[in-house]
Swiss-Prot record:
GO terms for cellular component: plasma membrane. One of its GO terms (biological process) is G protein-coupled receptor signaling pathway. It holds the Pfam family 7tm_1. It is a multi-pass membrane protein. High affinity receptor for melatonin. The activity of this receptor is mediated by pertussis toxin sensitive G proteins that inhibits adenylate cyclase activity. This is Melatonin receptor type 1A X2.0.
Length: 153
């Protein structure tokens, strides 16, 4: 385990990871320039992704930028939770040891879970509205402006 860790998280590996993050960030934003989906939206007073430019592109953005991360993280959390439950039922630690280690072990898991829930709550409304309008464009006029604006904030 330690040899893999030392290889993956070396100085050169870290530089590669930072470079990969920048390449992925540019790869995520460049299609907007070709589709022409960056527009000034007077409802939110900002230059943002215009969901009405291309239905297919909006569907792809919602799938790759929202549902795919939600699906992957949900799968990982399910696997982690099953593993934690299986280990907890297999090993019966001493009560004193249990009280010392359990809060520290579960604290990191709960913190990551809260971050995941916040991601879903913050980005969910905007992406669900965008996906709904992309699938059925006439519905876009019936969405109240306050709901659209609230989904951005």
């Amino acid at each position: 385990h330690s040899s893999w860790y030392n290889r993956l998280f070396s100085n050169s590996g870290t530089i590669c990871y930072v470079g990969l993050v920048w390449v992925l960030a540019l790869g995520a934003i460049l299609p907007n320039l070709f589709v022409g989906s960056l527009r000034c939206d007077p409802r939110i007073f900002s230059c943002t992704f215009a969901q009405y430019v291309s239905s297919y592109y909006t569907i792809a953005v919602v799938i790759f930028h929202f549902f795919l991360p939600i699906g992957v993280v949900s799968y990982c959390y399910l696997r982690i939770w099953v593993l934690v439950l299986n280990i907890r039922h297999r090993v019966k630690p001493d009560r004193h040891l249990h009280h010392q280690t359990w809060p520290y072990n579960i604290h990191g898991f709960i913190t990551m879970f809260v971050v995941f829930v916040l991601f879903a709550v913050c980005w969910g409304p905007l992406n669900i509205i965008g996906l709904t309008v992309a699938i059925y464009p006439p519905l876009g006029d019936s969405i109240p402006q306050w709901l659209f604006v609230a989904s951005y904030f």
